[in-house]
UniProtKB/Swiss-Prot annotation:
Family: Belongs to the class-A beta-lactamase family.
Major location category of this protein: secreted
Keywords on record: Antibiotic resistance, Hydrolase, Plasmid, Secreted, Signal
Functional summary from the UniProt entry: Extended-spectrum beta-lactamase (ESBL) which confers resistance to penicillins, as well as first, third and fourth-generation cephalosporins. Has cefotaxime-hydrolyzing activity. Inactive against cephalosporin antibiotic, cefoxitin, and the carbapenem, imipenem.
Gene3D superfamilies linked to this entry: DD-peptidase/beta-lactamase superfamily
Cellular-component GO terms for this entry: extracellular region
Gene that specifies this protein: bla
GO BP terms in the entry: beta-lactam antibiotic catabolic process; response to antibiotic
Signal peptide residue numbers: 1-30
Active site: S73
Record's protein name: Beta-lactamase CTX-M-8
Control of this protein's activity: Inhibited by the beta-lactamase-blocking agents clavulanic acid, tazobactam and sulbactam; in the DH5alpha strain of E.coli.
Compartment list: Secreted
Length: 291
């Protein structure tokens, strides 16, 4: 009896050792990524948040992923998605025309400024907000929805309990350290972006439209995309604000595999600090190396 017990214990020990040895390379790889992100953060002098979700197996790479960061213009994805959600039941909402006045223009209006004293449809405003980061377009979307709290309500309705939009453009970009207004976490945003673009938060037609808009973004070449192989397809939304806040959220289609969801948020201690898209590109390269 004792001989059998000792043999069984030896087999269990051998199995445990084999399991540990088998997982050691994965652990070392994950630890290496964390160390590289920490080194990047330290060298950049700011605070970095990263969340990567591999939709093939739901594996996650996280760095400060549960800390709050100012969203800045990455919040435009939620506003546009809320309008798309309306279009599931209000078939003509995207073609609804909105008047553009000179008094509507604020600090960045590359598309809406061309339509002063005219109109734009909600579809055109959504495209302007997502693909050119037009701030007046964002405000028009928010106004149509009924205010920032309605954008937050949409987030709650699709299962995001972290996102909060409190203000309109341009004040939502103040990004004051410790200010919870207009913030989310990298992980929450990654999960929501996945739900909106690859999941069931939107109908098939609306989901396809959102993906098309994101793939047509004109502002992201120097951010996440710059850290990826040129053959990969990217749909993203950038954002920037005070304290050198520099953000990008993306759906990524590597060649021959399931999509990746990547959120990179970065902010700095000085209010007048310059944007650091290079930090986002470096973070993207670190976490996607090996895919």
């Amino acid at each position: 009896m004792m001989r059998h017990r000792v043999k069984r214990m030896m087999l269990m020990t051998t199995a445990c050792i084999s399991l540990l040895l088998g997982s050691a390379p994965l652990y070392a790889q994950a630890n290496d990524v964390q160390q590289k992100l920490a080194a990047l953060e330290k060298s950049s002098g700011g605070r970095l948040g990263v969340a990567l979700i591999d939709t093939a197996d739901n594996a996650q790479t996280l760095y400060r992923a549960d800390e709050r960061f100012a969203m800045c213009s990455t919040s435009k994805v939620m506003a546009a998605a809320a309008v798309l959600k309306q279009s599931e039941t209000q078939k003509k909402v995207l073609s609804q025309k909105v008047e553009i006045k000179s008094s509507d223009l604020i600090n960045y209006n590359p598309i809406t400024e061309k339509h002063v004293n005219g109109t734009m449809t909600l579809a055109e405003l959504s495209a302007a907000a997502l693909q050119y980061s037009d701030n007046t377009a964002m405000n028009k979307l928010i106004a149509h929805l009924g205010g920032p709290d309605k954008v937050t309500a949409f987030a709650r309705a699709i299962g995001d309990n972290t996102f909060r939009l409190d203000r309109t453009e341009p004040t939502l970009n103040t990004a004051i350290p410790g200010d919870p207004r207009d913030t989310t976490t990298p992980l929450a945003m990654a999960q929501t972006l996945r739900n909106l673009t690859l999941g069931s938060a939107l109908g098939e037609t609306q989901r396809a439209q959102l993906v098309t808009w994101l793939k047509g973004n004109t502002t992201g070449a120097a951010s996440i995309q710059a850290g990826l192989p040129t053959s990969w397809v990217v749909g993203d939304k950038t954002g920037s604000g005070d304290y050198g806040t520099t953000n990008d959220i993306a759906v990524i289609w590597p060649e021959g595999r399931a999509p990746l969801i990547l959120v990179t948020y970065f902010t700095q201690p000085e209010q007048k600090a310059e944007s650091r898209r290079d930090v986002l590109a470096a973070a993207a390269k670190i976490v996607t190396d090996g895919y």
